[in-house]
Amino acid sequence: MDIKQLREKSADELKAHLTDLRKEQFSLRMQQVTGQLPKTHETRRVRREIARVKHLLGSTK
């Protein structure tokens, strides 16, 4: 998701999105450990999106 789209969301929506991203990150990590992850770039994308959401949550306080 683009940073502009994230800025339009409320803090509660960002927290919910962060929870979903962390679940996705855990799932991707488990797939990577078991050797079942065909698209390894997805872990990087999720990690960066988590950083974007955390940045926005920190700046709104």
Swiss-Prot record:
A GO cellular component annotation in the UniProt record? cytosolic large ribosomal subunit
* Keywords recorded for this protein, A-Z: Ribonucleoprotein, Ribosomal protein
Pfam family of the protein (one)? Ribosomal_L29
Question: CDD domains attached here?
Answer: Ribosomal_L29_HIP
Q: Please cite one Gene Ontology biological process associated with this protein.
A: translation
Renumbered to this chain, the signal peptide range is none
**Database matches in HAMAP family:** Ribosomal_uL29 (MF_00374)
**What family does the Swiss-Prot or TrEMBL record give for this protein?**
Belongs to the universal ribosomal protein uL29 family.
What's the protein name? Large ribosomal subunit protein uL29
Species annotation:
Xanthomonas oryzae pv. oryzae (strain KACC10331 / KXO85)
According to the entry, what is the taxonomic lineage of the organism?
A: Bacteria, Pseudomonadati, Pseudomonadota, Gammaproteobacteria, Lysobacterales
Q: Which gene is this protein's source?
A: rpmC
